[in-house]
Amino acid sequence: MSNRRSRQSSSAPRISDNQMIDLVSKLRQILPEIGQRRRSDKASASKVLQETCNYIRNLNREVDNLSERLSQLLESVDEDSPEAAVIRSLLM
């Protein structure tokens, strides 16, 4: 079992500490909750990753909700109308 684990980890590309720091720094810049903080109030890498996961989950929920609303809207318009074509394109 340890051989399998070592083979799996050796086949995955390794991320250097500098790359990790750079990636976390980029996440800090793009996450709304973190970007609003003062410079002196920097979040830890762990906190940044946790907030990133939460943000992605929230975005997925929003996409699901919007898709549901578009589906309901599509049911209420004539299926041959230009509006229906636009709605269908948004759902794809």
UniProtKB/Swiss-Prot annotation:
Pfam families: bHLH_ILI (PF23174). It is found in: Nucleus. InterPro entries: bHLH_dom, HLH_DNA-bd_sf, PRE. Residues 4-59 form the bHLH domain. One of its GO terms (biological process) is regulation of growth. Keywords: Brassinosteroid signaling pathway, Gibberellin signaling pathway, Growth regulation, Nucleus, Transcription, Transcription regulation. Disulfide bonds: none annotated. One of its GO terms (cellular component) is nucleus. One of its GO terms (molecular function) is protein dimerization activity. Expressed in roots, leaves, stems and flowers. Induction: By gibberellin and epibrassinolide. PANTHER family: TRANSCRIPTION FACTOR PRE, TRANSCRIPTION FACTOR PRE1. Interacts with IBH1 and HFR1. Gain-of-function mutants (T-DNA tagging) show long hypocotyls, pale green and slightly narrow leaves, elongated petioles and early flowering. They are not sensitive to the gibberellin inhibitor paclobutrazol during seed germination. This is Transcription factor PRE1. It comes from Arabidopsis thaliana (Mouse-ear cress). The gene is PRE1.
